Amino acid sequence: MKSLLFFLFMLFWQTTIAQIPDHIFVFLNNKPDKAKIAEEEVKKIMDGHMTNINRLAKEGKLIAAGPFDGGGGIFIFKSSSIDQVREWLTTDPGVQANRWNVEVLPYYPQHGLVCAAQEPYQMVTYQFIRYVPYVAKDNITQQPELLKKHQDYLKVLSGSVSVITQATFGDAEGGIFVVNGEITKEVIENDPAVGQGLLVAEVKKLWIAKGAFCEK
């Protein structure tokens, strides 16, 4: 019964699950247990990381990239294949050195698209909210109802904030809600799915080139 409910949860969460994505989203998550190395080596790795970013962008593979305050960041690749993107990532010195916990996910925008920002780049900051599903015995039967309430809540919220993008990752991997401005902790926690523990909201500040989400 639990397996059936989880399957229904995945279907409800991502109605585009069977679609082939146009882009692949990568999280470079902070890695608390990464090896401690000399500052000179860190600089060498990060210089190589930036060089590799520029190369992938010039080749038309990497469409958008940006760091989070506090470390880590994101990539958005022009590809429909997770395996292909994993192969491209092997050229990154930071990935080679295991400096991040890397997640590679299909990307399904519901609001906002993905565009290659034009030079000269204007870096901007956005509030970046990631919703991570937390499936537990005490919330599994409420999932369809809570996820609908979550989507309805974001629709209402969109009327009061400047939404840059909203997207899901398919296969019950959650999604993101990115805004120009700041949503308070109280408002985020008032989301029914967050309040009931079905979704964990991770809030960060993202630096990215203006126009990366096709925003004006």
Residue ranges and their predicted role:
Residues 1-22:
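Bacterial Sec-dependent N-terminal signal peptides
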Residues 19-216:
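Conserved, structured core segments of small domains
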